[in-house]
């Protein structure tokens, strides 16, 4: 289940806000310019589906958000717990960074933790199946896929080479807990 916790950036122990309600999550994130939506497939997505089958199941939403935000390319990324490069992949974006284009992800299956650092607050968003998150360009954040990553996500890009992390060099991400899903997520 999706979850948003908001902390003061100086107090990683006690959240000021904690909710699993999708509407409450969307309302809180909207205040900082982040979009949070729930999507539903127009057809079942079976385990082992090709990227084309995944995108076809969400075509109406993909086309809508691409038109609204000017995305030029869309792809599907799939990470499994047995991936031999999982530790390297996890470590890639664990430190605070930003991108020069929006980071938009839709979770077809599995989960991951986006953590945003905005105005002396830390927004910890657990995204799960059917969640779309759109993080505006320039927003400081980090992403944790967990020690045994399992997710399938649709990614949106305005420029194929524009999605590069620019790291801040701060240690704030290390002050907050790493992602450990409450229970394993099964492919959907």
UniProtKB/Swiss-Prot annotation:
Purpose of the protein: Catalyzes 2 different reactions between oxygen and the acireductone 1,2-dihydroxy-3-keto-5-methylthiopentene (DHK-MTPene) depending upon the metal bound in the active site. Fe-containing acireductone dioxygenase (Fe-ARD) produces formate and 2-keto-4-methylthiobutyrate (KMTB), the alpha-ketoacid precursor of methionine in the methionine recycle pathway. Ni-containing acireductone dioxygenase (Ni-ARD) produces methylthiopropionate, carbon monoxide and formate, and does not lie on the methionine recycle pathway.
Site entry: May play a role in transmitting local conformational changes: 102
HAMAP family registered for this protein in UniProt: Salvage_MtnD
Cofactor binding description: Binds 1 Fe(2+) cation per monomer.
GO terms (BP aspect): L-methionine salvage from methylthioadenosine; L-methionine salvage from S-adenosylmethionine
EC number in record: 1.13.11.54, 1.13.11.53
Chain positions of site May play a role in metal incorporation in vivo: 96
GO molecular function annotations of the record: acireductone dioxygenase (Ni2+-requiring) activity; acireductone dioxygenase [iron(II)-requiring] activity; iron ion binding; nickel cation binding
Pathway(s) the chain acts in: Amino-acid biosynthesis; L-methionine biosynthesis via salvage pathway; L-methionine from S-methyl-5-thio-alpha-D-ribose 1-phosphate: step 5/6
Site keyed Important to generate the dianion: positions: 105
Organism: Xanthomonas euvesicatoria pv. vesicatoria (strain 85-10)
Cofactors required: Fe(2+); Ni(2+)
Quaternary structure, from the entry: Monomer.
SUPFAM superfamilies, alphabetized: RmlC-like cupins
Coiled coil: none
Gene, per the UniProt record: mtnD
Keyword presence, Transcription: no
Protein name: Acireductone dioxygenase
């Amino acid at each position: 289940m999706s979850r948003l916790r908001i902390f003061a950036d100086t107090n990683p122990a006690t959240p000021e806000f904690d909710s699993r309600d999708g509407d409450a999550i969307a309302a809180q994130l909207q205040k900082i310019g982040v979009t949070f939506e729930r999507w539903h497939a127009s057809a079942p997505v079976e385990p082992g589906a090709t990227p084309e089958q995944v995108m076809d199941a969400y075509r109406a939403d993909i086309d809508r958000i691409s038109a609204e935000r000017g995305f030029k390319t869309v792809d599907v990324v799939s990470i499994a717990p047995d991936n031999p490069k999982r530790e390297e992949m996890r470590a890639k974006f664990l430190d605070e960074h930003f991108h020069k284009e929006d980071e938009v992800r839709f979770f077809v299956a599995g989960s991951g933790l986006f953590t945003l650092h905005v105005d002396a607050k830390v927004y910890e968003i657990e995204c799960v199946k059917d969640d779309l998150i759109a993080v505006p360009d320039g927003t400081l954040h980090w992403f944790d896929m967990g020690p045994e990553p399992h997710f399938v996500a649709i990614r949106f890009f305005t420029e194929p080479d524009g999605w590069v992390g620019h790291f801040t060099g701060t240690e704030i991400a290390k002050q907050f807990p790493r992602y450990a899903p409450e229970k394993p997520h099964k492919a959907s």
